[in-house]
Every structure is written in structure tokens, then in C-alpha cells.
Curated annotation (Swiss-Prot):
Example GO BP: SOS response
HAMAP family referenced in this protein's UniProt entry, alphabetically: UvrB
Gene (UniProt): uvrB
Main location: cytoplasm
Positions annotated to bind ATP: 39-46
Gene3D superfamilies: 6.10.140.240, P-loop containing nucleotide triphosphate hydrolases, UVR domain
Organism per entry: Legionella pneumophila subsp. pneumophila (strain Philadelphia 1 / ATCC 33152 / DSM 7513)
Protein name as catalogued: UvrABC system protein B
């Protein structure tokens, strides 16, 4: 237990970090259920939490409000704890259209989904780490409160093999089939097994690039080895191995049979209800759909939409909470909720939206009432299951403020950087004044963020600035995650100088190059101009030594006053600390790649950086062929969330298209 977690870093805690670390550790050791780390932008909150984890030596679940932030946190913790099981647990859907029915137009929408296999593998790897290891750190999104396979059923389906034990080949193959592995005679892929005589090759569903070889002799396990499925090279001989199921929803045969019987009973009860209400179409529809599912479960052990029968598969009572990732956590685990002012309300809002859609499906005979128990956790259920918790935010929400037993403040940054100076200027001349400021900041080699209230205003401002020779881009809600990452990358690289948007605070990403944040119409009260939003937006300039914020307003609203007072309080504390310790503020020097470090660090190690080929002497046919090849690569990387690689290929792709146009 002495060195269960070990941080690898060139830095030591500084600024307010040592005090915050000591305060949080003391709170955890005293048994406090909920604490808050109130840390300003750029104060090293992740580093503080890493030290808390190292000191407490407990498995940890870290929840972020979106995949982008989760990927960033995963990259940071992976760098801090290279020897530990840092895992990634987010929704594995690239695209998801839930099953739904619209009574007004009598339209039924079938469930349609595209699953990202690599993220599915990482989810399986995350639960495996929680089961097998004490040094697990899981970075997750709100996906953690959604139904997952029952841990008891999952554990009962594990396949344990040891060298020298008696084991019949047919039994092993049967168990692999029950675990939903598929047999192949071709190249081995994840979730498959292959048989050659007495040799069984298995590619575990939770493994990224290593497979297992089982060699049998006379119904005895003669040898177990890890090998590379691509080259066939033996990597390591093993005394024993545990193969985990292909999916979290795998269920023992006897539980499937029990489920089928319970579903039949519920079906008869529901049909009687519908017939009594003279809902004959709904009754016929329900009987047809449910009988088909029953047949599939009996034949294959699963069916499409099997999660709708999860109440019976996990042996729960009606209304009982579904098993989730929280059921895989050991009792001594820690829970860290990042950007809690966003994440906590998000957790609270998931249940109702899901419930409304499913009630329609039940009422119109598409699903049995038990399908309502395939749902995310209610907020009170989430609270019951949460272990000791630390909320992290620069602007904690009302829930954290009310329920936290201890607030550790982290206002002083290790770099000595001070919160941006805030100026208030009149609305009347805001556009002309802004343009003047933009030109000054660009001349210094820095970048600018501008936040507006409406989409229309953002578009008009972008067009106006562009007409006046300023390199500007517009970030809005229709931009998907990959493109959003590319836009932020391009801003940092200087491809353009000004980013205009409506809600630029939701990224939570590091942009040290931003020296000016301009907030237009700051005196219009509302969500986008609340105290919390203003503090978060002003904080976007806090990573730059010359960071400033300009609020364009004719009156000072209550939210503005509170935000200004809090910012000034922080500035005074930071200045006093710097003066007392003789610290000169230093800018953050962070490479552009750092922002994009996410869930694919392991993969990137195998990529060799090649010099861009010279295409000047290529024929149009060769260029077209290369453009098509690059386009496929670009979309493949983007689909796998490999943002950095996708962006690099995109740059080359655009160069080639430009060259082709000149021919």
C-alpha cells in the first residue's frame, strides 16, 4: 500500500495547492462526506486532486460534464500516474437515436446506433480495472449513472484458466460463446476466438492490442501466453488468465430462462389491461414484439433491446435502481466531480427526459411497463450510491455550497498569474471599441475571445470583423466535438486571431494565448450573463500574463457586481501572496498538442512523425487519389476521437485540394 499511487511530475505543489491538498486530505480522513475545491482557472486543480489520490491510496471515479473534458482529464491523469490503471468510461455511441413513438403523427422511430468499438473496449477495461486492481482511476461522464450489466451476473461469467488444470476444450468454447465471443477462422479481432487443433486463440474484449493463446494437451491446459494477434509474436508466458465477457450485459443461461418466464407473466397481465381498455392494436403490437424478443433470448441468449428487460436480468423489484458503474466501485472509493456547477445539474436532469419518452412507448404497446426500469439513476439514488465526494469548480453551484462540509480555496496560482483586470465600457460604441482593442492585441501576438448574446449577433459580428481584415471564426452549438477541437487548435496556432461565440465558457480548455476576453451586452441579466457565467468567461483570459476582460455595459447589474467583487477579491489575494513571496507572474507555456491529449495516448505512441511529402510534381490523377485516401484517414481518426491526428491530416488534405485547383 506504501506506493499504490505514484505521481510522475517535474513540479511540486505551489501557491494555494499545498494548503488545499492538506485541507481535502484532512476532510477525507475525518470522514466528511462532501467537500468542494474552489479553484480559479489555471490554479492546477487537477494536480491538487492527483496529490489527494496519491495520499489517500483509494480507487477514484472522476466525473466530467462532457467527453471533451473527460478526454483532457484522462490525458492529464494518465501522465501523472503512468504506472496505475487510469481508465476512460464514456458513452460508446458515435451516433444514438433512441427508440421513440410520436402519437401525433403515428410515427415509430426504431433505435439506431453506431458504436465506437475502441471506446467500448475502454469501458470494459475500466470495469475490469475496478474488479482486479486497487489502484484504478476512472475518468467518466454522466454515462456512469446509466444502466450497466449487473456486476454479480458479470462476475459469474468470467472464465478462469490456470496452467496444469483439467479443462475440456468443448467446455471452454461453450463458455466463450455464452460470453458472446464469436468464432472466426480468419484474422483475430477484438471479441473473437479462433481454434486450431488443441490451440485456442482469444482476443479479450477489454484488450486493445494483445490476445491470449491457450494450448491444451489431453484435456489439460498445457500453456497460456499473451501474444500479438498481428504478428503472432509471443509476448509473455502466464501461469493463469481470466477472460472477461464481451459485453457488460452478458447473463448466465439460467437467469435468461428465469427472465423469459417473468416476461411471459408480465405480458399476459399487460395484454389483459390493454384489451380491457379496448386498445386492441396496442395489445397485438406488444404481443408480437415481446414474443419475438423471447424467441431471440431463448435461441441466442440475447436480443436487440435486451436492456429493456434489465429489471428481470438483474433480479430487481419494480422501481428499484438499475446497476451502474457505481455498483462496480469498491466501498472505500473516492468520487471527484469536475466542473460541478455543470455536472451536478446534468446528473439531476437525466431521469425525467428518459422517463417521458419511455412512458409513451409503454402506453402505445411498444414496450412492457418493466422497460421503465431501464433508466439512469434518479438524483437521490445517485446521492445514496456516492462515496466520499469532492466537487471541483471555479464557481460552485447552490447544491455544492449547501451540502459541502469543507471548502478548500485555491485562488493563488503556482505560476503567480493574477486574475484578469476587468474594465467596463459603454454598449453604444462596443463594436468600434472592440475592433480597436482587437488590433492592439493581435499586434502583441495574442488571441481574443468575444462572447455575444445571440447567434444572429455572433454571425453579424464575425462577418463585420472579417470585412475589416481580421482573421475571425465563429463557434456555435451546431459545431460537433471534433470540429470544435480543431477550431480551438487553430486559434492557438494562430490560423486566426479572434473567436466569436455565445457560450465560450463550456469548453473548460486551456488557451494560454488568449489575452483578451470581450463580453458584449454584459448588463443583460440571464443565464449567459449570470454571476457564474461571467466569472467563468472572464477566467478564459487568466492563463495569460497580459490577460484582460472588457465588459460592455451601460448599467452594472447585480450579477456583474458580484462577479466584479469576487474577481477583485481574488486579485488582491493573489497580489498579496506574490508580494510576500517575491513571485513574478509567469505565463503558461503549454504546447498545442497538450490540449488534445485524450483517450488515445497509448495509440499515439506507435505513430511515427513523417515529413510531409512534396506533391509539386504529382499529376492530377495522383493528387485526386491521395486526396481521397487522406479524406478516409481523416474521418477514421475523427470517428475514433483522435483529434490531433485528424487535424494534421486535414491540413495536408486542404493543401492538396488547393494545389489541385491551381492545375
Amino acid at each position: 500500500m506504501k506506493d499504490l499511487f505514484k505521481i510522475y511530475s517535474n513540479y511540486q505543489p505551489a501557491g494555494d495547492q499545498p494548503t488545499a491538498i492538506a485541507s481535502l486530505i484532512d476532510g477525507l480522513e475525518s470522514g466528511l462526506a462532501k467537500q468542494t475545491l474552489l479553484g480559479v482557472t489555471g490554479s492546477g486543480k487537477t494536480f491538487t486532486i492527483a496529490h489527494v489520490i496519491q495520499a489517500m491510496k483509494r480507487p477514484t471515479l472522476i466525473m466530467a460534464p462532457n467527453k471533451t473534458l473527460a478526454a483532457q482529464l484522462y490525458g492529464e491523469f494518465k501522465a501523472f500516474f503512468p504506472d496505475n490503471a487510469v481508465e476512460y468510461f464514456v458513452s460508446y455511441y458515435d451516433y444514438y437515436q433512441p427508440e421513440a413513438y410520436v402519437p401525433a403523427s403515428d410515427t415509430f422511430i426504431e433505435k439506431d446506433a453506431s458504436i465506437n468499438e475502441h471506446i467500448e473496449q475502454m469501458r470494459l477495461s475500466a470495469t475490469k480495472a475496478l474488479i482486479e486492481r486497487k489502484d484504478a482511476i476512472i475518468v467518466a461522464t454522466v454515462s456512469a449513472i446509466y444502466g450497466l450489466g449487473d456486476p454479480d451476473s458479470y462476475l459469474r461469467m468470467l472464465l478462469h484458466l490456470s496452467r496444469g488444470e483439467q479443462s475440456d476444450q468443448r467446455k471452454i468454447l461453450k463458455r466463450l460463446a455464452e460470453m458472446q465471443y464469436t468464432r472466426t477462422n480468419l484474422s483475430l479481432e477484438r471479441g473473437q476466438f479462433r481454434v486450431h487443433g488443441d490451440v485456442i486463440d482469444i482476443f479479450p474484449a477489454d484488450s486493445e492490442k494483445e490476445a491470449i493463446r491457450i494450448e491444451l494437451f489431453d484435456d489439460e491446459v498445457d500453456n497460456i501466453a499473451r501474444f500479438d494477434p498481428l504478428t503472432g509474436e509471443i509476448l509473455q508466458r502466464l501461469p493463469r488468465v481470466t477472460i472477461f465477457p464481451k459485453t457488460h450485459y452478458v447473463t448466465p443461461r439460467e437467469r435468461i430462462l428465469e427472465t423469459v418466464e417473468k416476461v411471459k407473466v408480465e405480458l399476459q397481465e399487460r395484454l389483459a389491461e390493454l384489451n380491457a381498455q379496448n386498445k386492441l392494436v396496442e395489445a397485438q403490437r406488444l404481443e408480437q414484439r415481446t414474443c419475438f424478443d423471447i424467441e431471440m433470448m431463448l435461441e441466442l441468449g440475447y436480443c436487440s433491446g435486451i436492456e429493456n428487460y434489465s429489471r428481470y436480468l438483474s433480479n430487481r423489484e419494480a422501481g428499484e435502481a438499475p446497476p451502474t458503474l457505481f455498483d462496480y466501485l469498491p466501498p472505500e472509493a473516492l468520487l471527484i466531480i469536475d466542473e460541478s456547477h455543470v455536472t451536478v445539474p446534468q446528473i439531476g436532469g437525466m431521469y425525467r427526459g428518459d422517463r417521458a419518452r419511455k412512458e409513451t412507448l409503454v402506453n402505445y404497446g411498444f414496450r412492457l411497463p418493466s422497460a421503465l426500469d431501464n433508466r439512469p439513476l434518479r438524483f437521490e439514488e445517485f446521492e445514496e450510491r456516492s462515496p466520499q465526494t469532492i466537487y471541483i469548480s471555479a464557481t460552485p453551484g447552490p447544491y455544492e455550497q449547501e451540502h459541502s462540509d469543507n471548502v478548500a480555496e485555491q485562488v493563488v496560482r503556482p505560476t503567480g498569474l493574477i486574475d484578469p483586470e476587468v474594465e467596463i465600457r459603454p454598449v453604444k460604441t462596443q463594436v468600434d471599441d472592440l475592433m480597436s482593442e482587437i488590433r492592439q492585441v493581435i499586434a502583441q501576438g495574442s488571441r481574443i475571445l468575444v462572447t455575444t448574446l445571440t447567434k444572429r449577433m455572433a454571425e453579424d459580428l464575425t462577418e463585420y470583423l472579417s470585412e475589416h481584415g481580421i482573421k475571425v471564426r465563429y463557434l456555435h452549438s451546431d459545431v460537433d466535438t471534433v470540429e470544435r477541437m480543431e477550431i480551438i487548435r487553430d486559434l492557438r496556432l494562430g490560423e486566426f486571431d479572434v473567436l466569436v461565440g455565445i457560450n465560450l465558457l463550456r469548453e473548460g480548455l486551456d488557451m494560454p494565448e488568449v489575452a483578451l476576453v470581450a463580453i458584449l451586452d454584459a448588463d443583460k441579466e440571464g443565464f449567459l450573463r449570470s454571476e457564474r457565467s461571467l466569472i467563468q468567461t472572464i477566467g478564459r483570459a487568466a492563463r495569460n500574463v497580459k490577460g484582460r476582460a472588457i465588459l460592455y455595459a451601460d448599467t452594472i447589474t447585480g450579477s456583474m457586481q458580484r462577479a466584479l467583487t469576487e474577481t477583485e477579491r481574488r486579485r488582491e489575494k493573489q497580489k498579496a501572496f506574490n508580494l510576500e513571496h517575491g513571485i513574478t507572474p509567469k505565463g503558461i507555456n503549454k504546447s498545442v498538442e497538450d490540449i488534445l491529449e485524450g483517450a488515445y495516448i497509448g495509440k499515439r505512441k506507435t505513430v511515427v512523425a513523417e515529413k510531409s511529402p512534396q506533391y509539386t510534381h504529382w499529376s492530377p490523377q495522383e493528387l485526386v487519389k491521395q486526396i481521397n485516401a487522406l479524406e478516409k484517414q481523416m474521418y477514421s481518426h475523427a470517428q475514433n476521437m483522435e483529434f490531433e491526428l485528424a487535424a494534421k491530416i486535414r491540413d495536408e488534405y486542404l493543401l492538396l485540394k488547393e494545389q489541385l485547383m491551381k492545375i
